[in-house]
């Protein structure tokens, strides 16, 4: 069987359990906007938002592709949008944005290989199975099996890098591309310095030879979420769902392999495309964190958008409030801009 589907599954149960705690004793019923704002101030923002998204139905699937299994969450009906998370999150990071986009689209949120509930393919000495090229090809297979030969593609962090690679390697598959808070791998490494290394520490630490970085992550799986790089305003139960990935040594090794690929073979793939003047020709939206590293590191390059326009001539975008994880921390503004992008 290609994939097994379960409606309102264990993952939704996790969300419901976390969300309903916010409602206990409140007798909220249907929230007006004013009531929601007041409630958000009085309770955890995660819980308050949840009262509005908890009624949105979604299914979960395990899709078998080329010897691996990809876990996904599916919302809505209509033209397809594929959402791809980054480090250190899973598909759960889209829990607020996905329902907004599902009003007139089918929204597919995947766990990348090794993350969350997806499979963990064996790696090789050249890290090719965890290259962005291999991961992108896998996602194309997923969408083909789901019956979506073309789709809008949105990626954040590592998922953004898988997404732009997919758009370069499979241009006929991607109708529109949105990449959140990253620049191309080659461009990031070519501009790296001490400030880069201190800010983007996972690039440096996790790309080291096995098993040094694996030992650090497994030894303190919650540490990354206490760091500004991974911190968020989510509830304890959502945090526990994220952290569970880093308690599994096989998953941690797979994640480190992806970072090793980003320091080696992914750079080669980017360089080959740049030297061949290969470009992303579909419409592209780039959003980045206001006041974050992309907003401050690359001013001399006309900002991150200036860098992206060397790769995607139709790119446009802006800075966003909410930090690196603005799709999760500021889903309202993110949703407005993505919907505008989809309507053009």
Name every feature range the model reports, one short phrase each.
Residues 15-23, 27-31:
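N-terminal export leaders
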Residues 36-43:
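Signal peptide processing junction and immediate N-terminal pro/mature segment
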Residues 44-59, 68-70, 80, 93, ...:
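Flexible "cap/lid" subdomain of the alpha/beta-hydrolase fold that forms the substrate-access gate
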Residues 79-85:
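Short beta-strand element of the alpha/beta-hydrolase
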């Amino acid at each position: 069987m290609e994939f097994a589907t379960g409606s309102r599954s264990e993952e939704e149960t996790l969300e419901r359990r976390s969300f309903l705690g916010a409602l206990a004793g409140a007798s909220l019923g249907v929230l007006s906007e004013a009531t929601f704002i007041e409630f958000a101030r009085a309770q955890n923002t995660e819980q308050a938002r949840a009262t509005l998204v908890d009624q949105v139905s979604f299914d979960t699937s395990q899709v078998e592709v080329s010897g691996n299994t990809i876990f996904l969450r599916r919302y809505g009906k209509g033209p397809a949008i594929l959402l791809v998370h980054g480090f250190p999150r899973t598909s759960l990071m889209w829990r607020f944005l996905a329902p907004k986009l599902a009003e007139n689209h089918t929204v597919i949120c995947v766990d990348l290989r090794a993350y969350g509930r997806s499979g963990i393919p064996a790696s090789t000495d050249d890290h090719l199975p965890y290259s962005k090229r291999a991961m992108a090809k896998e996602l194309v297979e997923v969408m083909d099996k789901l019956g979506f030969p073309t789709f809008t593609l949105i990626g954040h962090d590592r998922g953004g890098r898988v997404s732009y690679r997919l758009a370069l390697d499979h241009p006929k598959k991607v109708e529109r591309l949105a990449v959140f808070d990253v620049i191309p791998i080659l461009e990031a490494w070519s501009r790296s310095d001490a400030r880069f290394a201190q800010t983007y520490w996972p690039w440096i630490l996790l790309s080291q030879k096995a098993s040094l970085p694996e030992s650090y992550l497994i030894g303190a799986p919650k540490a990354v979420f206490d760091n500004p790089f991974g911190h968020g305003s989510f509830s304890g139960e959502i945090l526990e769902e994220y952290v569970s990935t880093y308690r599994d040594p096989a998953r941690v090794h797979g994640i480190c392999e992806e970072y090793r690929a980003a320091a080696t073979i992914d750079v080669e793939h980017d360089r080959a495309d740049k030297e061949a003047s290969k470009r992303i020709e579909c419409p592209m939206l780039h959003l980045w964190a206001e006041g974050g590293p992309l907003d401050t590191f690359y001013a001399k390059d006309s900002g991150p958008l200036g860098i992206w326009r060397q790769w995607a001539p139709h790119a446009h975008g802006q800075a966003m409030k909410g930090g690196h994880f603005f799709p999760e921390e500021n889903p309202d503004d993110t949703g407005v801009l993505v919907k505008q992008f989809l309507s053009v």
